C-alpha cells in the first residue's frame, strides 16, 4: 500500500509534457486542438491483437494490469494521439456488484443472471471496497502512468448508470432493450433503486481511478438515445448529474449518445466536456451549450473507410465548422475494428496540422 501511494504522489507532482487535452477541458488557451479516439486501444492495431492473442481473451486482458497498461500505451507510440485511455470495459462495474458477464465471440456481452425483481437486487451489492474487486483497473492505471512518464494525460472511464442498468436487466446487448425499458413502466421503484446503487458504485469507482492517477474521466451513456426526453431526464440524467456533481478532483466528460432531445439539459450538467456523436450538428450544439463547456467529437467513424484524401477533407470540414477553441477532437463514436490504422493516422495528423483561427 505504501508503494502504491508513493507512485501516486510521484504522478500527482509530475508535470504532463503534452497537456493539451487538460487545457482544452478546462477552457484554457491551446495552440491546436487535442485529438484522441474512443476505442483507440483495440483491434485496429496489430500490436494489440498480438497481446490479446497470447491470452485467453478480452476479459483476461482487462483483468491483467501489466497487459492492460501495455495496450493502453500502444496508441501513443503508434498513432500519436494526445491522450491515453485506460484499457478496460464498462461492464466491470456490474461484475463487481455481483453480476458476472461473459463476452461471446461475435455476439457481445452476456449475463447468466439478470435483475428484474426486488429479490434479484442481491446481485447489485454496493458494500465492497473498490480496490478489492476492481483493483486490477486501478493497478493498470498506476502501471500505465509509470510507463507514460508524463508524456500525455491518462483518461479513466465508467459506464453511465442508465447504460449499466440496461445490461444488468436485459442480460445482453439489444437494439431495443425492451426488458430494461419495460421495468421503467412496470416497476419504477425497482428501477430507481438499481440506478441508485449503480450510481453509488460508479462514483466510488471513478474517484478510485483518479486517486490511482487518472488525469481526466469520461462517463459513457451508450444507450441514452433509446429513451424519450422525459424518461431520460428521470432515469438517465438524474443519475448522471449526481456523478458529475460528486467528481471534482479531475475534469469530467459526459457522452450521452443519441440524446438529442435532452441537449439543453446535458448542457446544464456540471461537467467540463460534453461528447457529441456524429449525428449531431456541432454548430447547433455549440449554440445550445455556449462557451462555458468544451465539446468533444464528432467525425463519423465511417469516414475512416474513405481514401486518405477524403479523410483529410472531411476532417478539415469538421474542424472548420467549430465555433470555439473549446474543443477536443474525436470521432462521434468508437473507432471500428476493421479500420486501417493508416487512415487513423491521417485523421490525427490532419487535426495536428490544422491552424486554429
Describe the function of each predicted region.
Residues 48-50, 99-114, 167-180, 290:
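Short, flexible, mixed-charge acidic loops at enzyme active sites
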Residues 11-105, 242, 341-357:
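N-terminal basic, low-complexity leaders that serve as flexible interaction/assembly modules and, when applicable
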Residues 133-357:
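Active-site loop segments of alpha/beta catalytic cores
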Residues 50-62, 118-130, 267:
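Short, basic, glycine/proline-bearing loop/turn elements
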Residues 83, 112, 153:
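Short, flexible active-site-proximal loops enriched in glycine and acidic residues
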Residues 3, 7-10:
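Short, positively charged and aromatic/hydrophobic N-terminal segments
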Residues 90-93, 108-109, 118-119, 161-163:
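A short acidic, glycine/proline-enriched capping/turn motif at secondary-structure boundaries
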Residues 106-146:
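A gly/proline- and charged-residue-enriched helix-loop-helix capping module
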Amino acid at each position: 500500500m505504501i508503494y502504491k501511494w508513493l507512485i501516486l504522489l510521484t504522478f500527482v507532482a509530475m508535470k504532463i509534457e503534452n497537456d493539451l487535452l487538460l487545457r482544452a477541458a478546462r477552457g484554457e488557451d491551446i495552440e491546436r486542438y487535442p485529438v484522441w479516439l474512443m476505442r483507440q486501444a483495440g483491434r485496429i492495431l496489430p500490436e494489440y491483437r498480438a497481446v490479446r492473442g497470447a491470452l485467453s481473451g478480452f476479459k483476461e486482458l482487462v483483468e491483467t494490469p501489466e497487459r492492460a497498461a501495455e495496450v493502453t500505451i500502444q496508441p501513443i507510440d503508434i498513432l500519436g494521439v494526445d491522450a491515453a485511455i485506460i484499457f478496460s470495459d464498462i461492464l466491470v462495474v456490474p461484475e463487481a456488484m455481483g453480476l458476472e458477464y461473459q463476452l461471446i465471440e461475435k455476439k457481445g456481452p452476456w449475463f447468466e443472471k439478470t435483475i428484474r425483481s426486488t429479490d434479484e437486487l442481491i446481485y447489485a451489492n454496493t458494500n465492497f471496497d473498490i480496490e478489492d474487486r476492481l483493483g486490477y483497473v486501478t493497478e493498470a492505471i498506476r502501471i500505465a502512468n509509470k510507463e507514460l512518464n508524463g508524456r500525455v494525460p491518462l483518461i479513466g472511464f465508467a459506464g453511465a448508470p442508465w447504460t449499466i442498468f440496461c445490461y444488468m436487466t436485459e442480460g445482453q446487448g439489444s437494439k431495443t432493450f425492451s426488458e430494461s425499458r419495460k421495468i421503467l413502466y412496470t416497476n419504477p421503484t425497482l428501477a430507481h433503486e438499481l440506478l441508485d446503487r449503480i450510481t453509488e458504485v460508479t462514483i466510488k469507482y471513478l474517484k478510485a481511478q483518479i486517486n490511482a492517477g487518472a488525469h481526466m474521466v469520461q462517463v459513457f451513456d451508450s444507450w441514452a438515445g433509446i429513451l424519450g426526453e422525459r424518461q431520460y431526464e428521470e432515469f438517465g440524467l438524474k443519475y448522471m448529474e449526481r456523478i458529475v456533481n460528486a467528481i471534482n478532483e479531475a475534469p469530467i466528460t459526459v457522452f450521452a449518445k443519441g440524446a438529442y432531445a435532452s441537449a439543453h439539459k446535458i448542457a446544464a450538467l456540471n461537467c467540463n466536456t460534453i461528447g457529441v456523436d456524429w449525428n449531431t450538428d456541432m454548430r447547433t450544439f455549440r449554440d445550445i451549450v455556449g462557451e462555458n463547456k468544451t465539446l468533444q467529437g464528432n467525425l463519423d467513424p465511417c469516414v475512416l473507410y474513405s481514401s486518405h484524401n477524403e479523410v483529410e477533407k472531411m476532417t478539415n470540414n469538421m474542424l472548420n465548422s467549430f465555433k470555439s477553441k473549446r474543443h477536443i477532437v474525436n470521432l462521434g463514436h468508437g473507432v471500428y475494428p476493421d479500420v486501417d490504422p493508416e487512415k487513423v493516422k491521417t485523421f490525427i495528423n490532419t487535426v495536428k496540422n490544422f491552424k486554429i483561427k
